[in-house]
Amino acid sequence: EGCCSNPACRTNHPEVCD
């Protein structure tokens, strides 16, 4: 949800989905 489902944000913050 949020940054986790946003490809650009996920690229910059890969640990957010961890």
Swiss-Prot record:
InterPro entries in the record: Conotoxin_a-typ, Conotoxin_a-typ_CS
Main localisation: secreted
Disulfide bonds: C3-C9, C4-C17
Keyword annotations of the record: Acetylcholine receptor inhibiting toxin, Disulfide bond, Ion channel impairing toxin, Neurotoxin, Postsynaptic neurotoxin, Secreted, Toxin
Pfam family, one: Toxin_8
Entry's Gene Ontology cellular component terms: extracellular region; host cell postsynaptic membrane
Tissue and organ expression note: Expressed by the venom duct.
Its biological purpose: Alpha-conotoxins act on postsynaptic membranes, they bind to the nicotinic acetylcholine receptors (nAChR) and thus inhibit them. This peptide is active on neuronal nAChRs alpha-7/CHRNA7 (IC(50) of 3.24 uM), alpha-3-beta-4/CHRNA3-CHRNB4, alpha-4-beta-2/CHRNA4-CHRNB2, and alpha-4-beta-4/CHRNA4-CHRNB4. 10 uM of this peptide inhibits these receptors by 85%, 40%, 19%, and 13%, respectively.
Family: Belongs to the conotoxin A superfamily.
Additional remarks: Negative results: does not show effect on the muscle nAChRs alpha-1-beta-1-epsilon-delta/CHRNA1-CHRNB1-CHRNE-CHRND (adult subtype) and alpha-1-beta-1-gamma-delta/CHRNA1-CHRNB1-CHRNG-CHRND (fetal subtype).
Protein name: Alpha-conotoxin Lo1a
Source species of the chain: Conasprella longurionis (Cone snail)
Lineage: Eukaryota, Metazoa, Spiralia, Lophotrochozoa, Mollusca
